[in-house]
Amino acid sequence: MYQDLIRNELNEAAETLANFLKDEANIHAIQRAAVLLADSFKAGGKVISCGNGGSHCDAMHFAEELTGRYRENRPGYPAIAISDVSHISCVGNDFGYDHIFSRYVEAVGREGDVLLGISTSGNSANVAKAIEAAREKGMKVITLTGKDGGKMAGSADIEIRVPHFGYADRVQEIHIKVIHILIQLIEKEMVK
């Protein structure tokens, strides 16, 4: 009944991944991002991650697997996803939704830390403001974006962009794979 739809969805996902893999710059960007994060951890820094909707879940997933574990038992790494509902509702109410992430970065971000901003469109105003706040704090910035990078294009030290212009779920599928690879590489870098 739905076999053709299932095949089409899986084929489109495979095609999106194949297109992402064609660009060697993506491979290099992932490696550079992992080394940047591991270097921050080794120097006493942390990563703060943020995003909206599914990207918010990805930001939490990234932090959870760094503080918890991925594939190997090892010490936890310093990672925070901006996901505190009290903070988000307070800042959203008092300052506006565009400031929910930047206000947190202002409060806990430090020079030597890294911000991971995730936005499938690259147009999330609250993530863009978090990038600005991170810059003011002397933090490094990594972005996971999609399409043409949107308003966030060119705003990061390292941008990992999925050049897919269809539905956001295809971009998210690559984002979660990139997140898992980042964690795997960080684990390798941390034992060097």
Curated annotation (Swiss-Prot):
EC primary class: isomerase
UniProt binding sites for Zn(2+): 61, 65, 172, 180
Any one Gene Ontology BP term: carbohydrate metabolic process
Family annotation (CDD domains): SIS_GmhA
Compartments, record wording: Cytoplasm
GO cellular component: cytoplasm
Documented EC number(s): 5.3.1.28
GO-annotated molecular function: carbohydrate derivative binding; D-sedoheptulose 7-phosphate isomerase activity; zinc ion binding
Recorded metabolic or biological pathway in which this protein acts: Carbohydrate biosynthesis; D-glycero-D-manno-heptose 7-phosphate biosynthesis; D-glycero-alpha-D-manno-heptose 7-phosphate and D-glycero-beta-D-manno-heptose 7-phosphate from sedoheptulose 7-phosphate: step 1/1
Free-text cofactor note: Binds 1 zinc ion per subunit.
InterPro entries: GmhA/DiaA, Phosphoheptose_Isoase, SIS_dom, SIS_dom_sf, SIS_GmhA/DiaA_subfam
Extra information: The reaction produces a racemic mixture of D-glycero-alpha-D-manno-heptose 7-phosphate and D-glycero-beta-D-manno-heptose 7-phosphate.
Subunit structure: Homotetramer.
Family: Belongs to the SIS family. GmhA subfamily.
Function: Catalyzes the isomerization of sedoheptulose 7-phosphate in D-glycero-D-manno-heptose 7-phosphate.
Name of the molecule in the record: Phosphoheptose isomerase
Organism expressing this protein natively: Enterobacter sp. (strain 638)
